[in-house]
């Protein structure tokens, strides 16, 4: 039976960053602890916001290259829609070595940790604060690190929200191009092209300029180069979609994969989705969104995160947010998304493993998803007749 669907235009109430406002100056008032924690592979700058609550997990964030926890996550966690969530969860922000504000340069000859070693440093953070488990939120390089952490320590990770995650090693051509171009002059351009899509660079000039200036003026360039080199030298995560009767390496926890439909990371995220357990994984493609959904559309991402944690059994009485109210008021129906789903992009043959691929992509939205319903089927097993992974667009 056909049903009429309605698109709802959701505009942000106010600009993300007001003119003259620093993107590093948006920290919400919390009980904040900042510490440099010694770990297995060196020191990490960690910021704990709020007080851990009993046996409830803490939200653990990890940022992308060219950013730190403030520039990557403050706009999201300071948004009105995240306030209800942060009342229920403490938040632990991790800065990669040397990426925090005011970080001194590493000494000559310093060996920066590999991506695997950066993941191995995180259990030390949990032990320092007495944390038993976390819900990870990572972007780009941070998403890779948190995925590796969850693969190594499944008992410590209850869920993952992964934005712009790339499960694959850097392609040879991309590695060679980055080496040939040099990094002194091209460093801001390299980072901007990683964070933002081509269309976004030309259409969202003010935000892109703000982040370019942050890279030039606030980041330690030698430290940033070391982090970029570590990310470009990453190994393939070697995850595989589980099949009945086989032993595969995959995430054991629920995962929400998030990507903007104009992001340079679309192909990589879709490939990651194809490698994960469909009964525990949701792919959220955000319409009219570029490379940083937590920056450009924090309200939508906050609601998606709320549904995600509700699916894990937390915040059962959380209030309706404006996205749900808008969609409900439009007359759209609510679907549970059970049963086999069409998964666009995942069966189109080999695709580029680079974040810079800008080939033609299908922009079709799975519009039967009348509401953001991203609760995974917690009782599903590999023996079920069809996959229950979900691809939703908003």
From Swiss-Prot:
<dbReference type="GO" id="GO:0005829">
    <property type="term" value="C:cytosol"/>
</dbReference>
<dbReference type="GO" id="GO:0005813">
    <property type="term" value="C:centrosome"/>
</dbReference>
<feature type="modified residue" description="Phosphoserine">
    <location>
        <position position="362"/>
    </location>
</feature>
<dbReference type="GO" id="GO:0030330">
    <property type="term" value="P:DNA damage response, signal transduction by p53 class mediator"/>
</dbReference>
<feature type="modified residue" description="Phosphoserine">
    <location>
        <position position="2"/>
    </location>
</feature>
<keyword id="KW-0597">Phosphoprotein</keyword>
<feature type="compositionally biased region" description="Polar residues">
    <location>
        <begin position="374"/>
        <end position="386"/>
    </location>
</feature>
<keyword id="KW-0472">Membrane</keyword>
<feature type="modified residue" description="Phosphothreonine">
    <location>
        <position position="328"/>
    </location>
</feature>
<feature type="modified residue" description="Phosphoserine">
    <location>
        <position position="326"/>
    </location>
</feature>
<feature type="compositionally biased region" description="Polar residues">
    <location>
        <begin position="327"/>
        <end position="339"/>
    </location>
</feature>
<keyword id="KW-0539">Nucleus</keyword>
<dbReference type="InterPro" id="IPR029058">
    <property type="entry name" value="AB_hydrolase_fold"/>
</dbReference>
<dbReference type="GO" id="GO:0007165">
    <property type="term" value="P:signal transduction"/>
</dbReference>
<feature type="modified residue" description="Phosphothreonine">
    <location>
        <position position="375"/>
    </location>
</feature>
<feature type="modified residue" description="Phosphoserine">
    <location>
        <position position="330"/>
    </location>
</feature>
<dbReference type="GO" id="GO:0031267">
    <property type="term" value="F:small GTPase binding"/>
</dbReference>
<feature type="repeat" description="3">
    <location>
        <begin position="359"/>
        <end position="368"/>
    </location>
</feature>
<feature type="modified residue" description="Phosphoserine">
    <location>
        <position position="336"/>
    </location>
</feature>
<feature type="modified residue" description="Phosphoserine">
    <location>
        <position position="364"/>
    </location>
</feature>
<dbReference type="GO" id="GO:0005737">
    <property type="term" value="C:cytoplasm"/>
</dbReference>
<dbReference type="GO" id="GO:0048471">
    <property type="term" value="C:perinuclear region of cytoplasm"/>
</dbReference>
<comment type="similarity">
    <text>Belongs to the NDRG family.</text>
</comment>
<keyword id="KW-0677">Repeat</keyword>
<feature type="modified residue" description="Phosphoserine">
    <location>
        <position position="352"/>
    </location>
</feature>
<feature type="region of interest" description="3 X 10 AA tandem repeats of G-[PST]-R-S-R-S-H-T-S-E">
    <location>
        <begin position="339"/>
        <end position="368"/>
    </location>
</feature>
<comment type="subunit">
    <text>Interacts with RAB4A (membrane-bound form); the interaction involves NDRG1 in vesicular recycling of CDH1. Interacts with APOA1, APOA2, PRA1 and RTN1.</text>
</comment>
<keyword id="KW-0206">Cytoskeleton</keyword>
<dbReference type="GO" id="GO:0055038">
    <property type="term" value="C:recycling endosome membrane"/>
</dbReference>
<feature type="repeat" description="1">
    <location>
        <begin position="339"/>
        <end position="348"/>
    </location>
</feature>
<dbReference type="GO" id="GO:0008017">
    <property type="term" value="F:microtubule binding"/>
</dbReference>
<dbReference type="GO" id="GO:0005912">
    <property type="term" value="C:adherens junction"/>
</dbReference>
<dbReference type="GO" id="GO:0043015">
    <property type="term" value="F:gamma-tubulin binding"/>
</dbReference>
<feature type="modified residue" description="Phosphothreonine">
    <location>
        <position position="335"/>
    </location>
</feature>
<feature type="repeat" description="2">
    <location>
        <begin position="349"/>
        <end position="358"/>
    </location>
</feature>
<dbReference type="GO" id="GO:0032287">
    <property type="term" value="P:peripheral nervous system myelin maintenance"/>
</dbReference>
<dbReference type="GO" id="GO:0071456">
    <property type="term" value="P:cellular response to hypoxia"/>
</dbReference>
<feature type="modified residue" description="N-acetylserine">
    <location>
        <position position="2"/>
    </location>
</feature>
<dbReference type="GO" id="GO:0005634">
    <property type="term" value="C:nucleus"/>
</dbReference>
<feature type="modified residue" description="Phosphoserine">
    <location>
        <position position="333"/>
    </location>
</feature>
<feature type="modified residue" description="Phosphoserine; by SGK1">
    <location>
        <position position="332"/>
    </location>
</feature>
<dbReference type="GO" id="GO:0045576">
    <property type="term" value="P:mast cell activation"/>
</dbReference>
């Amino acid at each position: 039976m056909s049903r009429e669907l309605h698109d709802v235009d959701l505009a942000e109430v106010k600009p993300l960053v007001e003119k003259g406002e620093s993107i590093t100056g948006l920290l919400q008032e919390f009980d904040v602890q900042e510490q440099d924690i010694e770990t297995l592979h060196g020191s990490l700058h960690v910021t704990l916001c709020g007080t851990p609550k009993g046996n409830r997990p803490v939200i653990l964030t990890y940022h992308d290259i060219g950013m730190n926890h403030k520039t990557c996550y403050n706009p999201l966690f300071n948004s009105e829609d995240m306030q209800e969530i942060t009342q229920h969860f403490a938040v632990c922000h991790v800065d990669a070595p040397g990426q925090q504000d005011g970080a001194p340069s590493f000494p000559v000859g310093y060996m920066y940790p590999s991506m695997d070693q950066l993941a191995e440093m995180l259990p030390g953070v949990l032990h320092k604060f007495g944390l038993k488990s976390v819900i990870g939120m990572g972007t780009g390089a941070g998403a890779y690190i948190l995925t590796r952490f969850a693969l190594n320590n499944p008992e410590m990770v209850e869920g993952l929200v992964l934005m712009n995650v790339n499960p694959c090693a850097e392609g040879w051509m991309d590695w060679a191009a980055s080496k040939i171009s040099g990094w002194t002059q091209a460093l801001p351009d390299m980072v901007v092209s990683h964070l933002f899509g081509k269309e976004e660079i030309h259409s969202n000039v003010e935000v892109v300029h703000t982040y370019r200036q942050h890279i030039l003026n606030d980041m330690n360039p030698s430290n940033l180069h070391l982090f970029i080199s570590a990310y470009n030298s990453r190994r393939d995560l070697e995850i595989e979609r589980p099949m009945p009767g086989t032993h595969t390496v995959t995430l054991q926890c629920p995962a929400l994969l998030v990507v903007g439909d104009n992001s340079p990371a679309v192909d990589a995220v879709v490939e990651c989705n194809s490698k994960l357990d469909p009964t525990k994984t949701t792919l959220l493609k955000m319409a009219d969104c570029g490379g940083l959904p937590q920056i450009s559309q924090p309200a939508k991402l906050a609601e998606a995160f709320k549904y995600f944690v509700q699916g894990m059994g937390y915040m059962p009485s959380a209030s309706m947010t404006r996205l749900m109210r808008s969609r409900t008021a439009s007359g759209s129906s609510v679907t549970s998304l059970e049963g086999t789903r069409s998964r666009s992009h995942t069966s189109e043959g080999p695709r580029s493993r680079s974040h810079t691929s800008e080939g033609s992509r299908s922009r079709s939205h799975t519009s039967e998803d009348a509401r953001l319903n991203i609760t995974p089927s917690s009782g599903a097993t590999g023996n079920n007749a069809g996959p229950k992974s979900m691809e939703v667009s908003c």
